[in-house]
A protein has these predicted regions:
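Alpha-helical residues within the helix-turn-helix
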Residues: 31, 49, 70
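Short alpha-helical "packing" element that flanks the helix-turn-helix/winged-helix DNA-binding module
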Residues: 13-20, 72
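Alpha-helical linker/hinge and terminal dimerization helices associated
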Residues: 50-51, 55, 72-87
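Short helix-boundary/capping micro-motifs
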Residues: 18-34
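A detector for short, charged/polar N-terminal pre-domain segments
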Residues: 1-9, 15
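A short LG(V/I)-centered, amphipathic sequence patch enriched
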Residues: 48-65
């Protein structure tokens, strides 16, 4: 994994990642986040570049997470929840 610069990390990328992991479908994630599927794809591309991993791969009717995505997701989900609860 690449070293992330947290000063410039777009937190929306983590929101997208969390929603994609929860839904396992880009279109549903886009709907839930009130955006478009291409915007979700673009955000995933940017996050993939940051972490140096595919994170999810297309399958049948949605996406399947990579091992790294499965490892990262609980931490990302908890961090977003803590941030949401504190604001």
């Amino acid at each position: 994994m690449n070293e992330l610069n947290f000063r410039t990390l777009d937190l929306n990328l983590l929101r997208v990642f969390d929603e994609v992991m929860a839904e396992r479908n880009l279109t549903r994630a886009a709907h839930n986040l009130a955006t478009t599927q291409p915007a979700i794809s673009n955000a995933l591309r940017r996050l993939r570049e940051l972490v140096g991993d595919d994170l999810v791969r297309r399958s049948g009717y949605g996406v399947e997470p990579t091992p790294l995505a499965l490892t990262l997701w609980p931490t990302v989900r908890d961090a977003l929840r803590q941030l949401r609860d504190s604001l």
